[in-house]
């Protein structure tokens, strides 16, 4: 030890104060000889010093000689080769090769008790080879090499039932991750998939996935206290490692999607290798196909974590649609129109395979999530149809005409009626077994959860269409109740009633469907019907009496106001007569409320308008109709009173 310290101290002091490049040859020879002497000394010391360990008798190791020689020697060597290209990297590689060869030579004599020294030399050899990588390559390639080396070390530890190589492999994975993300930037390359960003990310992702695959089941170890502690940590790693590797795999494709092409001329800006649409679909396709491959892996190995990415197909497609909207594109633009059906088909396949994967891969929480994905998929399809219709209206330049709103309401009506007809066939649980997937297990997700928000939107859309549309749908002439505006609104009301009847007939009835039997539903339908019939008269006044289509002109029009008074009274009369004959007291009261509204309008609106003759006509017409109502439709008795009367 005294010679070791003295030699190092003298060599270091001389190198610091007196060394110059012309001394390289003699200094290099001295350093090689010095290292060889003390390596031999460490081997001779181990040979001469037996030591009893847990696995038997081995030779002791002088840690100062074994570890001090290469560490201090490499420090001096790095100073000697500093002027040379990659001198430190080649020196580290030489140190690593030397110690690996020594370990291999001593391994044949492990039966003689050199096992401890072999492990020390192996650790030094692997360490120097690992160190050579960052000294020679940039950070992205360094991280890739470290990740591969870490996977190799983990595999060796798995085969040898030793925890230390496995721990070393995990540490290298962590270092690779830090090195890669610490220098991450937008790649510049003329070659697709052949640049450090993509290749580096792939070479980090694949080792992480391999380690996750090996560690998914408990691995053997020596049983020592340290090994048991490491085993508890290792048992927590497979799922996070898999997710980390899968995300890195997607990161590789993300780096490819943002790749820049080198500028053809100096000082000119670089251009994107992929258009925005192409980059979006590259990422979407890579994500869905990778998820499908992971699902196949999960089905083959029965590893539940590998199936997780395949259950996120719907969020991926939603993000793709949002990204498409963000750049102002539609589903009908470019190659998006064939890509969307393929992506939806793959998403459907993923749903089907997941739901039939077995209880060991699909727990109840994931099952509920997949059930809601059916609802979300229906909403996504509605959004895609709406986007395509928007593109069509834009292409036909129909904005500003009634056609735009008519197309929207008619399309929503068709979707609601289609889902009612298709999914409503399986509205009885007892009969679902004869239907194919997905109706046999998810019919309610389509005919109730998916359609209920659409029904509300359709009601609002029909209300807005009836309220705002002038009915001008050139080149078609305006015919009351037979024009596109009125027909679209009436069909919407019919579809809502059809859907309500199907839901009410369901067994068991969906949760929350009781609202469709409450007065609030009929109140909403009645309000929509009143608005529809009232605005029909507005459009008649506009088209046949030349009343301008604006709020001021319509409000101050004698034709509109008198027509409203008579129309609402007739509607109230019809409602009250029908309610009287059927004994529907709430409906009769609704008609009476409408009559009260007519009277209020006569007082507040008609009396304030000019023209005594106009007011007289309105009052006489309404008064006569009220007399008819009082004669033909008196208030029905309450339900209890009617029952007592019938019993008597």
Language model features with spans:
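Hydrophobic alpha-helical membrane segments
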Residues: 456-458, 590-601
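Hydrophobic alpha-helical transmembrane segments
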Residues: 567-572
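Short histidine
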Residues: 586
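Extended, compositionally biased regions that are outside compact catalytic cores
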Residues: 1-121, 128-524, 528, 534-565, ...
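Cytoplasmic C-terminal tails of single-pass
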Residues: 644-648
